[in-house]
Structure formats: C-alpha cells, structure tokens
C-alpha cells in the first residue's frame, strides 16, 4: 500500500531593517528547512544569502538546515551581524558617562 504524502504550508522570511521578503509555500511532508529555502526561490532573489554562513531558525529559535518543518512553521534566515553587540554597549555606556 502506498501512503499519500500530505501537504504542509510554511512561511519563509528574510528581513532587512527597511524591507522584508515573506512567502507562504506549500510542500509535501516530510521536508527540511533547506528544502523549503530552495523551493521558495529566495536564493535567486537575494544572492547574498549563503547557507554556509547565514543562520536559520524556526520562530526565532536556532535550527539546522536538516531539521524537519511542521505545518504553520515560520522559517527565518538571519543576516550576519554588522556590529559586535558588546562594542555597541561599550560605546553607549561611554556616551552616557560623558553626558552625566
């Protein structure tokens, strides 16, 4: 007996400070995060995405490209940090100290 695969719908998002790409995609399950990304077409639109460098997650929780997705999941592709958060805090603290 052949089992029917069921369809799931997931969202994929990639954001900049002033714009974002958000797409709902329907796929057969089981499927992985990497497959969702490849099927979405996002890599053609945003050529700076490198899956060897960019981290991914599901609903703000870190995940691996090989993790399976569930119906309703939001797959997020994260951009690399442009500044070190510790350095930014140091600069803010120094600015606050100068104002005081």
Curated annotation (Swiss-Prot):
Any Pfam family: Ub-RnfH
Transmembrane spans: none
Domain of life: Bacteria
HAMAP family (alphabetical): UPF0125_RnfH (MF_00460)
Record family assignment: Belongs to the UPF0125 (RnfH) family.
Name of the protein described by the UniProt record: UPF0125 protein HD_1828
């Amino acid at each position: 007996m052949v089992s029917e695969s069921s369809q799931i719908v997931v969202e994929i998002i990639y954001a900049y400070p002033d714009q974002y790409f958000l797409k709902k995609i329907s796929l057969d399950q089981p499927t992985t995060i990497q497959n969702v990304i490849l099927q979405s077409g996002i890599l053609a639109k945003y050529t700076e995405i490198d899956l060897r460098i960019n981290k991914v997650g599901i609903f703000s929780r870190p995940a691996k490209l090989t993790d399976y997705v569930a119906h309703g999941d939001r797959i997020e592709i994260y951009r690399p940090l442009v500044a070190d958060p510790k350095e930014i805090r140091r600069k803010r603290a120094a600015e606050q100290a100068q104002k005081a």
